[in-house]
Regions:
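Acidic, contiguous N-terminal accessory segments
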Residues: 19-132
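Bacterial Sec-dependent N-terminal signal peptides
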Residues: 1-28
Length: 132
């Protein structure tokens, strides 16, 4: 009888040990984003994907060199429209409370990174490279 109880305890222990939580999708971005909204839509990088940067000339050159040298293989373009990765330095972002913060938005047609500084754009690009 004692063996039967021990066997039952072991069986229950194995049963509970084999149960796992549902896998959660996480992003390996450091520092962790304040907010993440995962969508079903995806942006597909291809040979036609361009890079448009709307920032100061100094920041633009640094960001362009960094992204062109990356594994994303982007080609600079002169228009924001199209299947592009777009970096925009804007005057203000109400949802961001840091000069180095950024907003990264992905749609099937475009990847848009907005920030109020070159540093914010750089960190946005770094996050993009981490999730690609």
């Amino acid at each position: 009888m004692r063996r039967l109880i021990i066997l039952a305890e072991v069986a229950l222990g194995l049963l509970f040990a084999s149960c796992t939580k549902e896998e959660q999708r996480t992003l390996s971005v450091i520092p962790a984003p304040l907010k993440v909204e995962l969508q079903q839509e995806v942006f597909s990088l291809n040979s036609e994907t361009g890079l448009y940067i709307d920032a100061s000339e100094g920041d633009k050159k640094i960001l362009e060199d960094y992204l062109v040298a990356s594994s994303m293989n982007l080609k600079p373009v002169i228009a924001e429209e199209g299947h592009n990765v777009v970096l925009k330095q804007v005057a203000e972002l109400p949802e961001v409370n840091s000069s180095e913060g950024y907003v990264l938005t992905v749609t099937p047609d475009q990847v848009l990174i907005r920030a109020t500084s070159g540093a914010g754009l750089f960190y946005g690009v770094h996050s993009l490279l981490r999730v690609v």
